[in-house]
Amino acid sequence: MLKPLALATILLVAASSYCQKASEKSKRFKGMYFQWGYNKEWYTKSNLRFSLSNGDKFTVHKVKAHDSPDLDAIINVPTQISIPQYSYRIGFYLNKTKTKAIELNFDHIKYIATDYQTARVSGVYNGKIIDEQKLLDPQNFLHLEHTDGGNLMHINYVQIHHLLEKKATTKPLLNAIWKVGAGFNIPRTDVTWKGEQFNNQFHIAGYNISAEAGARYYFLKNIFFETTAKTGFVHYVNALANTAANKGNKVEHHFGYFELIGTVGFDINW
């Protein structure tokens, strides 16, 4: 959780410094914005394809999964703002009317394969070819989650449409907004294999594409609330599935998702 948050801080400082130089020299960007908020997800079923260091290769078919918003953590530990499923955006306006932007878009999502569901398992398991129904029991079989983050980092193109403007000014009051983008995944995968739990390291492990749409409301001059709905596709190509005793394990899977996001943001003008 801390690494993505630290990355957000570094990127914000770097982006601000870069944009100040850009505004002085090339006038390439017409302003920038920063947003922070939280999200909620729903996932499609996914086939988990395991490749273990002992030679076993098997697939757990049509696995159900859920998220874990953990919004109560903000009340219980107010300083730990990165415990819940958070989202941040750093955007750069491309025109004076601020209707077009390029955006760095990050979602800290939590993907949890639901325990104690029965799923078909096929392939080589314990050195034998199998095709049978198994219970996803962490003590006797396995558990998988990306709860230190599925962590979707991508670049968006943003289009903004002014719906309402403040009286006697040309400042926006209410905007419609849509975004499309693609990027990469930085998961930290927590695996329990026959009762042995291990939280793997962060690493780049695949790609994602998405589309997002919603509304942005300016309740103060340069401060806004944005709510959007987002849908996309995520492919974890080589997520680590190691345990303390066994290294070199990988899991590959992909799924679709639907997400609701609420953020507060502010514009920086020059």
Predicted regions and their residues:
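Outer-membrane beta-barrel translocator domains and adjoining extracellular loop/strand segments
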Residues: 46-53, 115-121, 169, 188-197, ...
